Amino acid sequence: MNGTEGPDFYIPFSNKTGVVRSPFEYPQYYLAEPWKYSALAAYMFMLIILGFPINFLTLYVTVQHKKLRSPLNYILLNLAVADLFMVLGGFTTTLYTSMNGYFVFGVTGCYFEGFFATLGGEVALWCLVVLAIERYIVVCKPMSNFRFGENHAIMGVVFTWIMALTCAAPPLVGWSRYIPEGMQCSCGVDYYTLKPEVNNESFVIYMFVVHFAIPLAVIFFCYGRLVCTVKEAAAQQQESATTQKAEKEVTRMVIIMVVSFLICWVPYASVAFYIFSNQGSDFGPVFMTIPAFFAKSSAIYNPVIYIVMNKQFRNCMITTLCCGKNPLGDDETATGSKTETSSVSTSQVSPA
């Protein structure tokens, strides 16, 4: 084995020289130079500085402007709440541990940080799935008389939390476990060992299938069909400038959504799957640290893509920040997204 396994940790470093110490008790500077830990701390500080204001502002602006309280925006607000869970429950902890060079909060703190980081990330992921399904139903009309209402939005929000809990909670009750990963400053699900005592192998397989492969397949299917539907509508109405604009907007939105999802999560999932599939293989601590920390940046990408791109929300946000006046003079009502309309138009397929 090229790593060192303890009762509550796995360090990707052989203890042949006797230098390995518990990541809950000693700085892990034998894994990486101190400046690398400082760099991680600086990165987490940046995510907090950017992630908290934009997600909090999303909630505040929606409370201030009743016109934003549409059913679909419930899902978007839920996305902001999930990102705040990641920022407050995970990022702040990781910032402090990175500054110290080891996980100073002990095993209990590791489970706390791992749970909230996983919960927030999974709620955000399943929000994207709900948004994809909503866009597919509204635009592609597999159910011609369907209208996305408040009850559907509430059901969608509840669904995201249920699915997230089915991923984040099992390690708390003995199915798998949370351990420090990479440079031992943040905690996540144990991809490093089989750990039969907690049936770790079955949980990791379950997590990859149910909480990664299936959501990815749903997102690709829904937005793939959406693009095809808009293209078909554009082909039938060559002279319709509105439809042509709708095609461009929805295509741009889909590309940004899919690419951002892949950029954030595929590197982390791929590295985790490689480590799990090659038990005992030789890999450095930075190998897992970089994709794990990069995946955390989704707390910034999500509100930018799903909130800031919405013209109505952007105008309301500017109005709020400018104490009730919009210096751009845009008409919020005219530019708002109305996802309930039945025609394939810009207002229907624009980012909600």
Curated annotation (Swiss-Prot):
Disulfide bonds: 110-187
Location in or out of the cell: Membrane; Cell projection, Cilium, Photoreceptor outer segment
Principal localisation: membrane
Site location (Plays an important role in the conformation switch to the active conformation): 113
Region Disordered, annotated ranges: 332-352
Membrane topology listed for this record: Multi-pass membrane protein
Keywords: Cell projection, Chromophore, Disulfide bond, G-protein coupled receptor, Glycoprotein, Lipoprotein, Membrane, Palmitate, Phosphoprotein, Photoreceptor protein, Receptor, Retinal protein, Sensory transduction, Transducer, Transmembrane, Transmembrane helix, Vision
Domain of life, per lineage: Eukaryota
Stored Pfam families: 7tm_1 (PF00001), Rhodopsin_N (PF10413)
Transmembrane stretches, start-end: 37-61, 74-96, 111-133, 153-173, 203-224, 253-274, 287-308
Segments in the Extracellular topological domain: 1-36, 97-110, 174-202, 275-286
Family per similarity comment: Belongs to the G-protein coupled receptor 1 family. Opsin subfamily.
Protein name as annotated: Rhodopsin
Organism of this sequence: Alligator mississippiensis (American alligator)
Gene: RHO
